[in-house]
Structures are given as structure tokens and as C-alpha cells.
From Swiss-Prot:
GO annotation terms (biological process): L-proline biosynthetic process
Species lineage: Bacteria, Pseudomonadati, Pseudomonadota, Gammaproteobacteria, Alteromonadales
Molecular function terms from GO: ATP binding; glutamate 5-kinase activity; RNA binding
UniProt similarity note: Belongs to the glutamate 5-kinase family.
Locations listed in the record: Cytoplasm
UniProt: substrate binding residues: S50, D136, N148
InterPro entries in the record: AceGlu_kinase-like_sf, Asp/Glu/Uridylate_kinase, G5K_ProB, Glu/AcGlu_kinase, Glu_5kinase, Glu_5kinase/COase_Synthase, Glutamate_5-kinase_CS, PUA
Reactions accelerated catalytically: L-glutamate + ATP = L-glutamyl 5-phosphate + ADP
Listed name of the protein: Glutamate 5-kinase 2
Pathway: Amino-acid biosynthesis; L-proline biosynthesis; L-glutamate 5-semialdehyde from L-glutamate: step 1/2
Enzyme Commission code: 2.7.2.11
Function: Catalyzes the transfer of a phosphate group to glutamate to form L-glutamate 5-phosphate.
Cross-referenced SMART domains: PUA
């Protein structure tokens, strides 16, 4: 096994509570022991920890509603309690922890993304275990990542991680729902995430948590495209974290793509929300996917939404399937003026020469 790997471990609410409404501190100790064993082997460990709402509910010792405001209040109460528990448990092994609370806004902006990356790397360089959660107490719908599965994928990209372990209450990804079908079998390895797999994943979650298997599959797809191997496994399994680093691999393993993206394209994959969409024709799709070409106006059929030059947009086909993401060199109104036009016509159509490419190949990433 390669030493000095960066391992992101995502612990869902169901793992930390054991399916109850309280944190299972005995199991948390066991998870900490395994993380510290990885550190002894020379690896860096990052925890993406759910459980703030559950900790807040336990701390208040009274019933609370389940509205957004109630959950944000519980997160505000519970986040301090949660980090205190992690700090106490890691201290048993002489390991320091550091807290980072993130929102989508921290990765939308390139400068903030780089600052978050530098802070994360500094914690690892000082042999500190970062404990990361979304800033649920203040995050609004516009800046929320939405679930810690996708947050952990973004963290794995930030940290340039080798592995992402998504620990849950399920053994992994099955051929059908094992809770309703006794004949369901575990899928041991996945090399490509397609529509059939997405259907298998469904969309279940727990009352205390926000993530089901569908969000884990989405997170796995993001991370593997950035060159991160992903494993979905049952968090209650004996030595599950250590086994994920051995040949006794539990759960479902998602193979990383053979060519990890460079830093700028990782950011395009991980961070910003798309401001709009550009629809392209079959010829443009072929040029992007087989020739590594830039997107020219001639291959564009429509621009959807309102976006400005420099915004991140999604590139889709006529069936609304996602083809790529990238930084546009024209606004939505300009794209609709030049769509279908030859490059030499752009200056005349816009009264200025903005260049031939709607998206330059250096500013886009294929999906």
C-alpha cells in the first residue's frame, strides 16, 4: 500500500448515531482509533462529519421542529458540541484536530477556493486532522452544498486526495434495494457511472440526515472524475476504514479516471454553480469529445438562462444531457446573437471582435 496518501472519510449521521437520535460515542471512539492507525502508517486523514443537528437535538434535551430554521438552530447548538467530542476523542491518541465550516460560496469563487485549499493543506502539513462540515447554521439555499456526500467530494478535490470513503448505513451499492429485495447483490466495483446505476441508487435518506445513495453516487462521480478513488461502505463494519485501505476491500469501489484533471479544471468540476446553459449540436459534441477542441459559435444552437462573460455555464445537448462545464467568453445575449455563425462573422454580429471561441478548451471540462 502506498504511504503518505490523503484519505477523506465522510461519516454520515446514520453512522454516528447508529440509527438512533443520539450520537454513538463508543462507535465514534472506534472510528477515531482507525483514523489514528492510518496516521501511524504515514497517511493524512480528513473527516467530513455530519451529526451537528443530531448533537444539537441531544444537547437541548427537548423536542424541536424540523423546519429549516429549527435545523439551523440545532446545527448552531450542536456544531460546538460535535467538534468538542471529536477533539476529546482524538486527544486520547495525541492527535490535534482543526475545524473548517464551508459553504458553496467558498468554492464558487476561485480566490476563496484557493484560500480554503491552502488552509486545508496547512492543517495537514502540521499533522492536524481537519474536521469539516457545511456551515449549516448560516447557509442559505443559494450557497448550500446541500449534503455532506457532495461536500466530501469537494473536499477531496480541494485536498488533492487519493481516496474518498463514504461511510453509511448500507454495505454499498446493490443491484436493487436490499431492504425490499432479498435477492439484491452487492456491486463490488464500478468503472463507469451511467443512467442504469443512477436508477439503482434511488433517493433515500434518513430523518436526521440529508443524504441517500443517490447523493453518494453523485459525489462518487464528481470525485472520480477528479482522479479520486471512492469507496461506499457500511460505517458500522469492523475495521471498515482500515479495510478500505487494504486488499480486504468492503463495499463498492468506484475506479478513478486514469487522467486526473489539473488544478484549474478540478475547480471547474468541483466548485461553481452554473449560471446558465449552452445547447450545442452533434458536430460540436464530436469536436469536443474526440478532438479536444474549443466550442465555436457555429456549433451552438441556443443559450438558456441569463449569464455574463466569465460565468461558469453548463454545456448540454438537445436532450438536455450534460456534456461539459466551462467559463463562457460571451454573455447569454451575445451567444444568442452569434449562435450558428462562422467565426469570421462574430465581429460583425456583435460590433466587436470577442474571439472565435465561445468556450476555450482550457476553460472547459468534459463530463
Amino acid at each position: 500500500m502506498q504511504r503518505d496518501q490523503v484519505i477523506v472519510v465522510k461519516l454520515g449521521t446514520s453512522v454516528l448515531t447508529g440509527g438512533t437520535d443520539k450520537l454513538d460515542k463508543a462507535h465514534m471512539v472506534e472510528l477515531v482509533r482507525q483514523c489514528c492507525e492510518l496516521k501511524k502508517q504515514g497517511h493524512h486523514v480528513i473527516l467530513v462529519s455530519s451529526g451537528a443537528v443530531a448533537a444539537g437535538r441531544e444537547q437541548l434535551l427537548k423536542p424541536c421542529g424540523r423546519s429549516v430554521i429549527d435545523k439551523q438552530m440545532l446545527a448552531a447548538v450542536g456544531q460546538g458540541q460535535l467538534i468538542h467530542i471529536w477533539q476529546s476523542l482524538f486527544a486520547l491518541y495525541g492527535v490535534n484536530v482543526g475545524q473548517m465550516l464551508l459553504t458553496r460560496a467558498d468554492v464558487n469563487d476561485r480566490e476563496r477556493y484557493l484560500n480554503a485549499r491552502d488552509t486545508l493543506n496547512a492543517l495537514l502539513n502540521y499533522d492536524v486532522v481537519p474536521i469539516i462540515n457545511e456551515n449549516d447554521a448560516v447557509a442559505t439555499s443559494e450557497i448550500k452544498v446541500g449534503d455532506n456526500d457532495n461536500l466530501s467530494a469537494l473536499v477531496a478535490i480541494l485536498a488533492n486526495a487519493n481516496k474518498l470513503l463514504l461511510l453509511t448505513d448500507q454495505e454499498g451499492l446493490f443491484t436493487s434495494d436490499p431492504r425490499t429485495n432479498a435477492d439484491a447483490t452487492l456491486i463490488g466495483e464500478v468503472s463507469d457511472i451511467n443512467d442504469e446505476l443512477r436508477q439503482l441508487a434511488g433517493g433515500s435518506g434518513t430523518n436526521l440526515g440529508t443524504g441517500g445513495m443517490a447523493t453518494k453516487l453523485q459525489a462518487a462521480d464528481i470525485a472520480r472524475r477528479a482522479g479520486v478513488e471512492v469507496i461506499i461502505a457500511k460505517g458500522a463494519g469492523k475495521n471498515v476504514i482500515l479495510k478500505c485501505m487494504s486488499e480486504q476491500l468492503p463495499g463498492t469501489r468506484f475506479l478513478k479516471l486514469t487522467a486526473p484533471k489539473e488544478g484549474r479544471k478540478k475547480w471547474l468540476l468541483a466548485g461553481p454553480k452554473s449560471s446558465g446553459q449552452i445547447v450545442i449540436d452533434a458536430g460540436a459534441i464530436t469536436a469536443l469529445q474526440t478532438k479536444g477542441a474549443s466550442l465555436l459559435a457555429k456549433g451552438v444552437t441556443n443559450a438558456l438562462g441569463a449569464f455574463e462573460r466569465g460565468d461558469l455555464i453548463s454545456v448540454i445537448n438537445s436532450d438536455k444531457q450534460l456534456i461539459a462545464r466551462g467559463l463562457t467568453r460571451f454573455s447569454s445575449s451575445e451567444v444568442n446573437k452569434i449562435k450558428g455563425a462562422h467565426s469570421k462573422q462574430i465581429g460583425e454580429l456583435l460590433d466587436y471582435d470577442g474571439g472565435a471561441e465561445v468556450l476555450h478548451r482550457d476553460d472547459l471540462i468534459l463530463l
